[in-house]
Amino acid sequence: MIRTLIALVPADKRGTLGLYTVLTVLSVVIRAAGTVLLVPLVAALFGDTPQDAWPWLGWLTAATAAGWIVDTTTSRLGFDLGFAVLDHTQHDVADRMPNIRLDWLTAENTATARAAIASTGPELVGLVVNLLTPLIGAVLLPAAIAVALVAVSPPLGLAALAGVVVLLGAMWASNRLSRKADTVADETNSAFTERIIEFARTQQALRAARRVEPARSLVGDALGAQHGAGVRLLAMQIPGQLLFSLASQLALILLAGMATWLTVRGELSVPEAVAMIVVVARYLEPFTSLSELTPAIESTRGTLGRIRAVLDAPTLTAGDAAPADTKSAPRIEFDCVTFGYGDHPVLDDVSFVLEPGSTTAIVGPSGSGKSTILSLIAGLHQPTEGRVLIDGVDAASLDDESRRAATSVVFQQPYLFDGSIRDNILVGDPGADEDRLAAAVRLARVDELTARLPNGDASKVGEAGAALSGGERQRVSIARALVKPAPVLLVDEATSALDTENEAAVVDALTADLRHRTRVIVAHRLASIRHADRVLFLDGGRIVEDGTIDGLLAAGGRFDEFWRRQHEAADWQITH
């Protein structure tokens, strides 16, 4: 945990971290000295010359004042470090997210990322002052007191040193017992949170299927897993707590017995023995504090682990290359490209060339790799083997800005942000002037939509575009893609879920765009590709047919069969 925290400290604060560490250790030494000073103070106070206690009281006062000054300075440095870690971590996580490989962002890892981002607030700021400082003190103070006791009473000091080893070992064993169960409990809590969100978002489908009872849904499974993990966690924590409690009691008995034995032998006076009992109590106190800190330590360990998981997530490689021409439609080439999601292969040794300004349709059965090709062109994924070339430049060697500026994408399920229609369109290019914005709105026929709304393009779309229909969301999405001055336009199943009217609007918008672009269209509905110059038919991750629409229809192969089935489905009707 401490290693992870140190790694999160920005480079310009490493000096502050070193000073903080030195002062924290100095604070421990001062507190240990102040504790052991009680022995000569009490001995003098109850001895034959009580006035001899004044110098020892002076030393104790000086140690207390010095400790207060050091602790105040340490707290200030701790807050400084905490805010530095917070700021550095938030920027690191935010900068990392746009470059994380999409195949890493599974449901589980997305929950991890969400929890990491949500917890990088007060918990990180308070980590140093409220947890790290007490943790260092709780671990080092008993050892420092034991070392100081060696100078007063070597047998008692050595016994105290042995007690440090035993108690820290008992605490380590206790934490070891519960750590794995705590990890499982944390994972099930995250999973339960995700299922609750999913349960709320899918109420329409669940009610239609009569699956509204949580017990009959995945929420019930997640709740059961959470309950089981909580029971296992308690089953592990209780034996660990009993083990540490037993070790603490044995240490107290051992040290008190040692002090009594030394007093009986005459090696300690009665006042010294009384003071030793006070010192022993002070010696055991940090272990109790450490035990109380354990839940917070484990929680923080989980938080730092989630942050580390996001920062260590695999990212897309990027270089410093840039295409020679960022405005003209580029030549796109797949050179022996192989790609898979984890162990699941999707594309197998795919090669083709798309000429500048051409419109290419990619069709084929579900799962054949069509959308994956678009993702590779857009730079959302990178090939496992082979290369994707943009005007002869390997896309993996492009800098991030060039890679993102090269393509404009219309997704099958468009996502609209919680803002106005205008705001959502300008996401494509915030610097677009009014003429370019108006042209994109007109081409996508968004003007027909805004004309019906009381606030026009200032109308709010709601979270994820909930205030608009599916076709209306797609029109806004297309306007967003068209307003972006990208030389490559990628369209992924943009009409698959639309009615005939909206499908026609989408197709007209895409074909009416006069910007010189290289276009790649993935479609199941063949009406969407009637203007394509070329068709690639994919099956099983390979290109099995390549040619013009008329040429492939005349060949009577897979595409022809696909085409005929589309027409048969279009002619299908219910008869009485």
Curated annotation (Swiss-Prot):
Spell out the family assignment given in the record's similarity comment.
Belongs to the ABC transporter superfamily. Siderophore-Fe(3+) uptake transporter (SIUT) (TC 3.A.1.21) family.
Tell me, how does this one assemble? Forms a heterodimer with IrtA.
TM ranges are 26-46, 53-73, 132-152, 153-173, 242-262, 268-288
List each copy of the ABC transporter domain by range: 332-565
Q: Name one GO molecular function term.
A: ATPase-coupled lipid transmembrane transporter activity
Originating species: Mycolicibacterium smegmatis (strain ATCC 700084 / mc(2)155) (Mycobacterium smegmatis)
PROSITE patterns referenced in this protein's UniProt entry, alphabetically = ABC_TM1F, ABC_TRANSPORTER_1, ABC_TRANSPORTER_2
> According to the UniProt record, what class of enzyme is this?
translocase
Q: Where is the ABC transmembrane type-1 domain?
A: 19-299
Membrane disposition:
Multi-pass membrane protein
> What's written under domain?
In IrtB the ATP-binding domain (NBD) and the transmembrane domain (TMD) are fused.
Residues on the membrane's Cytoplasmic side span 1-25, 74-131, 174-241, 289-576
| The enzyme's E.C. designation | 7.2.2.-
Residues folding into a coiled coil are none
The residue ranges for the Periplasmic side of the membrane come to 47-52, 263-267
Which SUPFAM superfamilies does its entry note?
ABC transporter transmembrane region, P-loop containing nucleoside triphosphate hydrolases
Protein name per UniProt:
Mycobactin import ATP-binding/permease protein IrtB
**What keywords appear on the UniProt entry?**
ATP-binding, Cell inner membrane, Cell membrane, Membrane, Nucleotide-binding, Translocase, Transmembrane, Transmembrane helix, Transport
Which gene name does the record give? irtB
A GO CC annotation given for this chain: plasma membrane
Query: According to its UniProt record, where is this protein located?
Result: Cell inner membrane
A Pfam family assignment: ABC_tran
Listed binding positions for ATP are G364, P365, S366, G367, S368, G369, K370, S371
Q: What does this protein do?
A: Part of the ABC transporter complex IrtAB involved in the import of iron-bound mycobactin (Fe-MBT) and carboxymycobactin (Fe-cMBT). Has a preference for Fe-MBT over Fe-cMBT. Transmembrane domains (TMD) form a pore in the membrane and the ATP-binding domain (NBD) is responsible for energy generation.
